[in-house]
C-alpha cells in the first residue's frame, strides 16, 4: 500500500482544527487547533505541521449550505485555501463538511472529553472527521 501523509483542516473564522493520519492512511488523529491571528501566523503554524508530518496534501472541509450550494463561508474557505496551497506548495482536496462540528461535539460528549470552554477540541475533532472521510473514500 502506498504511504500517504495528509493534513485535514477544519477552517473557521477564529480557529483552524488540524488532523493528521498514520503512514498507512487508515486512521486520522486530531493534532492541534490553531488560533487565527493573521494569515502569516496561520501559514507559519501550518508550515510547521506540514514539515513535521511530511504532508503531501491538504484535505479541507468545505462548509456547503444544506441545499448543497456554496455560501459565503464556503467561498471564504476556498479563498483562504487557495492562498495557503500556493504558499505551502501543496495540492488540496475538499470534503463536504456539513454537520461535522455537530458530529464532533456529539463524539466528544459521548467520550466524556467535552467542555463547553474548549471550542478547539471541537475544531480538532471536526478536522479528524474530515480527514477520516477522505481516507475512507480512497479505499
Swiss-Prot record:
Chief site of localization: cytoplasm
Example GO molecular function: nuclease activity
Keywords: Cytoplasm, Hydrolase, Nuclease, Ribosome biogenesis
EC number(s) from the headed UniProt entry: 3.1.-.-
InterPro entries referenced in this protein's UniProt entry, alphabetically: RNaseH-like_sf, YqgF, YqgF/RNaseH-like_dom, YqgF/RNaseH-like_dom_sf
GO cellular component: cytosol
GO BP terms, alphabetized: rRNA 5'-end processing
Function (record text): Could be a nuclease involved in processing of the 5'-end of pre-16S rRNA.
Protein's recorded name: Putative pre-16S rRNA nuclease
Amino acid at each position: 500500500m502506498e504511504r500517504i501523509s495528509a493534513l485535514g483542516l477544519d477552517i473557521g473564522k477564529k480557529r483552524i482544527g488540524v488532523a493528521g493520519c498514520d503512514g498507512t492512511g487508515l486512521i486520522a488523529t486530531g493534532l492541534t487547533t490553531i488560533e487565527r491571528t493573521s494569515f502569516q501566523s496561520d501559514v507559519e503554524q501550518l508550515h510547521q505541521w506540514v514539515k513535521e508530518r511530511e504532508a503531501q496534501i491538504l484535505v479541507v472541509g468545505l462548509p456547503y449550505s444544506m441545499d448543497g450550494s456554496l455560501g459565503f463561508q464556503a467561498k471564504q474557505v476556498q479563498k483562504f485555501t487557495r492562498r495557503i496551497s500556493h504558499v505551502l506548495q501543496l495540492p488540496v482536496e475538499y470534503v463536504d463538511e456539513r454537520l461535522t462540528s455537530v458530529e464532533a461535539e456529539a463524539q466528544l460528549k459521548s467520550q466524556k472529553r467535552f467542555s463547553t470552554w474548549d471550542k478547539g477540541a471541537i475544531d480538532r475533532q471536526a478536522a479528524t472527521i474530515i480527514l477520516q472521510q477522505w481516507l475512507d473514500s480512497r479505499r
